[in-house]
Protein backbone atom coordinates (compact mmCIF):
# COMPACT_ATOMS: atom_id res chain seq x y z
CA UNK A 1 0.00 0.00 0.00
CA UNK A 2 1.48 3.34 -1.10
CA UNK A 3 0.48 6.85 -0.07
CA UNK A 4 -0.91 9.62 -2.25
CA UNK A 5 1.45 12.56 -2.00
CA UNK A 6 -1.07 15.37 -2.50
CA UNK A 7 -3.45 14.26 0.22
CA UNK A 8 -0.52 13.47 2.53
CA UNK A 9 0.94 16.97 2.23
CA UNK A 10 -2.50 18.47 2.85
CA UNK A 11 -2.78 16.49 6.10
CA UNK A 12 0.70 17.67 7.08
CA UNK A 13 -0.53 21.26 6.78
CA UNK A 14 -3.50 20.51 9.03
CA UNK A 15 -1.47 18.61 11.64
CA UNK A 16 2.11 19.88 11.36
CA UNK A 17 3.22 18.71 14.80
CA UNK A 18 1.83 15.18 14.76
CA UNK A 19 1.64 14.05 11.13
CA UNK A 20 4.72 12.59 9.46
CA UNK A 21 5.26 12.27 5.71
CA UNK A 22 6.66 8.84 4.79
CA UNK A 23 9.78 8.44 2.71
CA UNK A 24 9.18 9.19 -0.96
CA UNK A 25 10.05 5.62 -1.96
CA UNK A 26 6.59 4.67 -0.66
CA UNK A 27 4.76 7.26 -2.76
CA UNK A 28 2.07 6.11 -5.18
CA UNK A 29 2.62 6.60 -8.90
CA UNK A 30 -0.95 7.22 -10.03
CA UNK A 31 -0.35 6.58 -13.71
CA UNK A 32 1.41 3.26 -13.13
CA UNK A 33 -0.59 1.86 -10.22
CA UNK A 34 -4.18 2.98 -10.56
CA UNK A 35 -6.69 1.48 -12.95
CA UNK A 36 -9.26 4.22 -12.33
CA UNK A 37 -7.85 7.67 -13.08
CA UNK A 38 -9.63 10.52 -11.32
CA UNK A 39 -9.29 14.21 -12.06
CA UNK A 40 -9.81 15.12 -8.39
CA UNK A 41 -6.93 12.91 -7.28
CA UNK A 42 -4.68 14.44 -9.94
CA UNK A 43 -5.51 18.01 -8.88
CA UNK A 44 -4.72 17.16 -5.25
CA UNK A 45 -1.38 15.78 -6.34
CA UNK A 46 -0.65 18.83 -8.51
CA UNK A 47 -1.76 21.62 -6.15
CA UNK A 48 -1.10 20.22 -2.67
CA UNK A 49 2.31 18.58 -3.04
CA UNK A 50 5.02 20.67 -1.39
CA UNK A 51 8.33 18.78 -1.40
CA UNK A 52 9.89 21.19 1.09
CA UNK A 53 8.58 19.19 4.04
CA UNK A 54 10.91 16.70 5.66
CA UNK A 55 9.94 13.06 5.66
CA UNK A 56 9.82 11.06 8.85
CA UNK A 57 8.59 7.93 10.57
CA UNK A 58 5.29 7.75 12.39
CA UNK A 59 5.91 7.01 16.08
CA UNK A 60 4.80 3.77 17.65
CA UNK A 61 1.49 3.90 19.48
CA UNK A 62 -2.25 3.35 19.35
CA UNK A 63 -4.94 5.48 17.72
CA UNK A 64 -8.67 4.81 17.99
CA UNK A 65 -11.16 6.54 15.69
CA UNK A 66 -14.41 6.35 17.61
CA UNK A 67 -16.87 7.45 14.93
CA UNK A 68 -15.64 4.85 12.45
CA UNK A 69 -14.67 2.30 15.14
CA UNK A 70 -11.21 1.89 13.63
CA UNK A 71 -8.36 0.74 15.85
CA UNK A 72 -4.74 1.21 14.70
CA UNK A 73 -1.67 0.17 16.68
CA UNK A 74 1.91 0.54 15.45
CA UNK A 75 4.60 -1.56 17.11
CA UNK A 76 8.28 -1.78 16.28
CA UNK A 77 7.90 -5.22 14.67
CA UNK A 78 4.48 -4.84 13.06
CA UNK A 79 1.43 -2.66 12.53
CA UNK A 80 -2.11 -3.76 13.36
CA UNK A 81 -5.49 -2.40 12.33
CA UNK A 82 -9.01 -3.68 13.07
CA UNK A 83 -12.51 -2.32 12.57
CA UNK A 84 -16.03 -2.44 13.86
CA UNK A 85 -18.37 0.03 12.18
CA UNK A 86 -21.33 -1.12 10.10
CA UNK A 87 -22.01 -2.71 6.72
CA UNK A 88 -23.50 0.31 4.96
CA UNK A 89 -20.43 2.49 4.59
CA UNK A 90 -19.42 4.34 1.39
CA UNK A 91 -17.97 1.76 -1.04
CA UNK A 92 -19.05 -0.77 1.58
CA UNK A 93 -17.44 -4.11 2.29
CA UNK A 94 -19.12 -6.60 4.64
CA UNK A 95 -16.22 -6.69 7.06
CA UNK A 96 -17.22 -6.24 10.71
CA UNK A 97 -14.35 -7.51 12.85
CA UNK A 98 -11.81 -7.70 10.04
CA UNK A 99 -8.17 -6.81 10.64
CA UNK A 100 -4.73 -6.38 9.07
CA UNK A 101 -1.28 -7.34 10.34
CA UNK A 102 1.55 -5.75 8.35
CA UNK A 103 5.33 -6.07 8.63
CA UNK A 104 8.24 -5.15 6.39
CA UNK A 105 7.15 -8.14 4.27
CA UNK A 106 3.85 -6.36 3.52
CA UNK A 107 0.31 -7.13 4.63
CA UNK A 108 0.62 -10.66 6.01
CA UNK A 109 -3.00 -10.81 7.18
CA UNK A 110 -4.46 -8.69 4.44
CA UNK A 111 -7.33 -6.64 3.12
CA UNK A 112 -7.83 -7.38 -0.58
CA UNK A 113 -8.86 -3.81 -1.37
CA UNK A 114 -11.11 -2.77 -4.23
CA UNK A 115 -11.75 -5.06 -7.16
CA UNK A 116 -12.26 -4.46 -10.85
CA UNK A 117 -14.95 -1.82 -11.38
CA UNK A 118 -17.72 -3.30 -13.50
CA UNK A 119 -21.42 -2.53 -13.82
CA UNK A 120 -22.39 -5.31 -11.40
CA UNK A 121 -19.78 -4.14 -8.87
CA UNK A 122 -22.11 -1.27 -7.92
CA UNK A 123 -25.42 -3.14 -8.26
CA UNK A 124 -27.23 -6.05 -6.67
CA UNK A 125 -24.35 -8.44 -7.37
CA UNK A 126 -21.84 -6.32 -5.43
CA UNK A 127 -21.34 -8.94 -2.72
CA UNK A 128 -20.70 -11.73 -5.19
CA UNK A 129 -17.27 -10.11 -5.61
CA UNK A 130 -14.87 -11.67 -3.10
CA UNK A 131 -13.19 -8.38 -2.22
CA UNK A 132 -16.53 -6.90 -1.06
CA UNK A 133 -17.99 -9.99 0.62
CA UNK A 134 -17.16 -11.10 4.14
CA UNK A 135 -15.84 -14.35 2.61
CA UNK A 136 -12.94 -12.21 1.36
CA UNK A 137 -12.12 -10.82 4.81
CA UNK A 138 -10.63 -12.25 7.98
CA UNK A 139 -13.99 -12.90 9.64
CA UNK A 140 -15.98 -16.08 10.40
CA UNK A 141 -18.56 -17.96 8.37
CA UNK A 142 -21.37 -19.42 10.49
CA UNK A 143 -23.31 -22.36 9.11
CA UNK A 144 -21.86 -21.37 5.76
CA UNK A 145 -23.40 -17.90 5.99
CA UNK A 146 -21.52 -14.66 5.42
CA UNK A 147 -22.19 -11.23 6.88
CA UNK A 148 -25.01 -9.20 5.36
CA UNK A 149 -25.08 -5.62 4.12
CA UNK A 150 -27.08 -2.86 5.82
CA UNK A 151 -26.84 -0.11 8.43
CA UNK A 152 -28.39 -2.39 11.04
CA UNK A 153 -25.47 -4.81 10.53
CA UNK A 154 -23.31 -3.00 13.06
CA UNK A 155 -20.62 -3.77 15.60
CA UNK A 156 -20.22 -2.49 19.15
CA UNK A 157 -16.81 -1.70 20.60
CA UNK A 158 -16.51 -3.18 24.08
CA UNK A 159 -12.93 -2.18 24.92
CA UNK A 160 -10.04 -0.37 23.30
CA UNK A 161 -6.68 0.42 24.79
CA UNK A 162 -2.94 0.31 24.25
CA UNK A 163 -2.86 -3.48 24.24
CA UNK A 164 -6.45 -4.58 23.61
CA UNK A 165 -9.34 -4.19 21.19
CA UNK A 166 -12.63 -6.04 21.66
CA UNK A 167 -15.93 -5.86 19.77
CA UNK A 168 -19.24 -7.66 19.50
CA UNK A 169 -20.57 -8.17 15.97
CA UNK A 170 -23.31 -10.79 16.04
CA UNK A 171 -25.60 -8.29 14.28
CA UNK A 172 -23.50 -8.67 11.15
CA UNK A 173 -25.05 -12.07 10.52
CA UNK A 174 -28.68 -12.85 9.75
CA UNK A 175 -28.70 -15.79 12.17
CA UNK A 176 -31.51 -15.55 14.71
CA UNK A 177 -30.02 -18.13 17.07
CA UNK A 178 -26.71 -16.23 17.32
CA UNK A 179 -27.14 -14.09 20.43
CA UNK A 180 -23.51 -13.04 20.95
CA UNK A 181 -20.25 -12.98 19.01
CA UNK A 182 -17.24 -11.34 20.61
CA UNK A 183 -13.80 -10.90 19.10
CA UNK A 184 -10.93 -9.86 21.34
CA UNK A 185 -7.40 -8.93 20.29
CA UNK A 186 -4.53 -8.70 22.78
CA UNK A 187 -1.35 -7.12 21.44
CA UNK A 188 2.21 -7.77 22.62
CA UNK A 189 5.45 -6.49 21.13
CA UNK A 190 5.93 -9.59 18.98
CA UNK A 191 2.49 -11.20 18.74
CA UNK A 192 -1.26 -10.68 18.48
CA UNK A 193 -3.61 -13.08 20.26
CA UNK A 194 -7.22 -13.36 19.09
CA UNK A 195 -10.17 -15.02 20.79
CA UNK A 196 -13.68 -15.42 19.38
CA UNK A 197 -16.61 -16.40 21.61
CA UNK A 198 -20.04 -17.44 20.28
CA UNK A 199 -23.39 -17.89 22.02
CA UNK A 200 -26.47 -19.53 20.48
CA UNK A 201 -29.88 -19.91 22.11
CA UNK A 202 -31.28 -22.88 20.17
CA UNK A 203 -29.22 -25.69 21.72
CA UNK A 204 -27.99 -26.86 18.31
CA UNK A 205 -24.47 -27.47 17.10
CA UNK A 206 -23.41 -24.87 14.55
CA UNK A 207 -20.70 -25.10 11.93
CA UNK A 208 -18.18 -22.29 12.40
CA UNK A 209 -15.34 -21.56 10.00
CA UNK A 210 -12.70 -19.11 11.16
CA UNK A 211 -11.22 -17.53 8.03
CA UNK A 212 -8.07 -15.49 7.53
CA UNK A 213 -7.09 -13.76 4.29
CA UNK A 214 -3.58 -13.49 2.85
CA UNK A 215 -2.12 -12.17 -0.39
CA UNK A 216 1.28 -13.73 0.39
CA UNK A 217 1.32 -17.47 -0.28
CA UNK A 218 1.05 -19.36 3.05
CA UNK A 219 3.56 -22.05 3.97
CA UNK A 220 2.35 -24.89 6.20
CA UNK A 221 4.99 -25.85 8.79
CA UNK A 222 5.11 -28.05 11.86
CA UNK A 223 4.73 -24.94 14.04
CA UNK A 224 1.82 -23.42 12.13
CA UNK A 225 1.01 -21.53 8.95
CA UNK A 226 3.68 -19.01 7.95
CA UNK A 227 2.51 -15.98 5.96
CA UNK A 228 5.36 -13.59 5.27
CA UNK A 229 6.72 -12.71 8.71
CA UNK A 230 3.64 -13.91 10.62
CA UNK A 231 3.17 -17.44 11.98
CA UNK A 232 -0.42 -18.50 12.66
CA UNK A 233 -0.39 -20.80 15.69
CA UNK A 234 -3.61 -22.66 16.43
CA UNK A 235 -4.52 -26.09 17.81
CA UNK A 236 -6.99 -26.61 14.96
CA UNK A 237 -5.84 -27.95 11.58
CA UNK A 238 -5.81 -25.36 8.77
CA UNK A 239 -7.19 -25.70 5.26
CA UNK A 240 -5.70 -23.35 2.66
CA UNK A 241 -7.60 -22.43 -0.48
CA UNK A 242 -6.27 -20.33 -3.37
CA UNK A 243 -8.63 -18.21 -5.46
CA UNK A 244 -7.77 -16.03 -8.46
CA UNK A 245 -9.77 -12.81 -8.76
CA UNK A 246 -9.46 -9.59 -10.76
CA UNK A 247 -7.87 -6.71 -8.87
CA UNK A 248 -8.60 -3.01 -9.32
CA UNK A 249 -6.43 -2.92 -12.45
CA UNK A 250 -8.29 -5.93 -13.94
CA UNK A 251 -5.22 -8.11 -13.43
CA UNK A 252 -5.18 -11.57 -11.86
CA UNK A 253 -4.69 -11.55 -8.09
CA UNK A 254 -4.10 -14.66 -5.97
CA UNK A 255 -6.07 -14.63 -2.70
CA UNK A 256 -5.45 -17.25 -0.02
CA UNK A 257 -8.18 -18.27 2.42
CA UNK A 258 -6.81 -19.94 5.56
CA UNK A 259 -9.71 -21.74 7.28
CA UNK A 260 -10.06 -23.44 10.66
CA UNK A 261 -13.07 -25.43 11.84
CA UNK A 262 -14.00 -23.94 15.21
CA UNK A 263 -16.23 -24.42 18.20
CA UNK A 264 -17.94 -21.73 20.25
CA UNK A 265 -14.55 -20.74 21.70
CA UNK A 266 -11.67 -20.19 19.29
CA UNK A 267 -8.14 -18.96 19.97
CA UNK A 268 -5.25 -18.24 17.65
CA UNK A 269 -1.95 -16.41 17.99
CA UNK A 270 -0.16 -14.47 15.27
CA UNK A 271 3.55 -14.54 16.06
CA UNK A 272 5.83 -12.01 14.37
CA UNK A 273 8.95 -13.74 13.10
CA UNK A 274 10.58 -10.95 11.09
Where do the protein language model's features map onto the residues?
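Residue-level structural signal for beta-strand termini and adjacent loop
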Residues: 85, 113-114
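Carbohydrate-active enzyme catalytic cores, enriched for enzymes
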Residues: 1-108
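CBM-like, beta-strand-rich accessory domains located in the C-terminal region of large
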Residues: 1-38, 114-274
Amino acid sequence: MRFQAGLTYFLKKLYPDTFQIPDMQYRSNMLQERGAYRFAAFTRLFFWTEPGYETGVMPDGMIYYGDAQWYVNKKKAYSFAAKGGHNDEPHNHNDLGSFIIATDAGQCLADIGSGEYTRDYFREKRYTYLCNASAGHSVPLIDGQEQLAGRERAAKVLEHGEHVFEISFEKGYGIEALTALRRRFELAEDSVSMRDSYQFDDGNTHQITERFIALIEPQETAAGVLVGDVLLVCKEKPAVNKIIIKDHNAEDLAVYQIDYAAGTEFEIQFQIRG
